[in-house]
UniProtKB/Swiss-Prot annotation:
It comes from Tropheryma whipplei (strain TW08/27) (Whipple's bacillus). GO terms for molecular function: GTP binding; GTPase activity; translation elongation factor activity. GTP hydrolase that promotes the GTP-dependent binding of aminoacyl-tRNA to the A-site of ribosomes during protein biosynthesis. It is found in: Cytoplasm. This is Elongation factor Tu. Disulfide bonds: none annotated. PROSITE patterns: G_TR_1 (PS00301), G_TR_2 (PS51722). InterPro entries: EF-Tu_GTP-bd, EF-Tu_GTPase, EFTu-like_2, EFTU_2, G_TR_CS, P-loop_NTPase, Small_GTP-bd, T_Tr_GTP-bd_dom. Residues 63-67 are annotated as: G2. CDD domains: EF_Tu (cd01884), EFTU_II (cd03697), EFTU_III (cd03707). Residues 177-179 are annotated as: G5.
């Protein structure tokens, strides 16, 4: 069967549902899918039922297995990819490894319970790993008849968001009932449409990868006799034109060069675009001047660093991780983009050790500099096997 062509007529936005266990994230996701499929029928808006979303397929991201569901739908304004993870651990792993980069998220809070422990944990994580916008779905609102209670829960959630650096005062809070909307109730179907209108309006259009400064991690280096050195990789973002000046950053001192040719599938190109696998011919660069693990970037856009604060999830023994805890001064490899660099971990004050299965904040000192930005993901490896994964939260030096 031929794959449906992806129509680029609307802006594309990645979102997800976050929040405490059993507050109705998956039910609400299914309700959004149902209501949109009925009210805005299209090829994209195909109803996904609860079970299909709940039995999330396994994905591997930086060596960690995560159960995660992806569904797509569209409003009149936009096309959305929506991620939902069934278990709490899957959420944490998803957010820390950036398995699904979110442009914004719907925080689901049950009106019957208010904000709970995992609500707080997800909001904190969303801030740390750089989810830029949240809005609130006050779910199970059909089960609370007292207006005062609804207002109190809303106030509490707004305060929680403000505490963690979100704009709690102005965040949209929409009262919904995922279950009632899923059962076809007209009033609660309207509430889902109101929620989607709030998503359309409060989560800004993301900056497309193509509009960001060019970056390509080097995967391989070749010499082409008579022409020079070619580096290959997949352009992560930006657009690069032939004869542009670039910098090669990481591992060694930063060097400037000019890209004199761009090739993809043995064809000459004028430009390399985000998402494309290409070879870049570098002027006056020797084969031994560059190596896997460095990145080719727009000059001045990314700098090399060795010390950072990160947030990491350490695999449990059952997930193929370590069998015993580790302590400060643990020296694993940190896998950034295409290469491993040894680093020394310092644990936060008051944390003696880290057990397999823990989520932690760490300070890391790398023995070689890496082209680094906040939000960059990494795997933690020991002798080639993954024992954890994380995200750079703050660059120190």
């Amino acid at each position: 069967m031929a794959k449906a062509k992806f129509e680029r007529t609307k802006p594309h936005v990645n979102i997800g549902t976050i929040g405490h266990v059993d507050h109705g994230k998956t039910t609400l996701t299914a309700a959004i899918s149902r209501v949109l499929s009925e009210r805005l029928p299209s090829n994209t808006n195909v109803k996904q039922d609860f079970d299909a979303i709940d039995s999330a397929p396994e994905e591997r991201q930086r060596g960690i297995t995560i159960n995660i569901s992806h569904i797509e739908y569209e409003t009149e304004k936009r096309h959305y990819a929506h991620v939902d993870a069934p278990g709490h651990a899957d959420y944490i792993k998803n957010m820390i490894t950036g398995a699904a980069q979110m442009d914004g998220a719907i925080l689901v809070v049950a009106a019957t319970d208010g904000a709970m422990a995992q609500t707080r944990e997800h909001v904190l994580l969303a801030k740390q790993v750089g989810v830029p916008y949240l809005l609130v779905a006050l779910n199970k609102a059909d089960m609370v008849s007292d207006e005062e209670i609804l207002e109190l829960v809303e106030l509490e959630v707004r305060e929680l968001l403000s505490t963690h650096g979100f704009d709690g005062e102005n965040v949209p809070v929409v009262r919904v009932s995922g279950l009632k909307a899923l059962e076809g109730d007209q009033k609660w179907g309207d509430a889902v449409m109101e929620l989607m209108k709030a998503v359309d309006e409060s989560i800004p259009d993301p900056v497309r990868d193509r509009d960001k400064p060019f970056l390509m991690p080097i995967e391989d280096v070749f010499t082409i006799t008579g022409r020079g050195t070619v580096v290959t990789g997949r352009a992560e973002r930006g657009v690069l034109a032939v004869n542009s000046e670039v910098e090669i950053v990481g591992i060694r001192p930063t060097q400037k060069t000019t890209v004199t040719g761009i090739e993809m599938f043995r064809k000459q190109l004028d430009e390399a675009w985000a998402g494309e696998n290409c070879g870049l011919l570098l002027r006056g660069t020797k084969r031994e001047d560059v190596e896997r693990g460095q990145v080719v970037v727009k000059p001045g856009s990314v700098t090399p660093h060795t010390k950072f604060e990160g947030k990491a999830y350490i695999l449990s023994k059952d997930e193929g991780g370590r069998h015993n805890p580790f302590y400060s001064n643990y020296r694993p490899q940190f896998y950034f983009r295409t290469t491993d660099v040894t680093g020394v971990i310092t644990l936060p004050e008051g944390t003696e050790m880290v057990m397999p299965g823990d989520t932690i904040s760490i300070t890391v000192d790398l023995i070689q500099p890496i082209a680094m930005e906040e939000g960059l993901g990494f795997a933690i490896r020991e002798g080639g096997r993954t024992v954890g994964a994380g995200t750079v939260v703050k660059i120190l030096e």
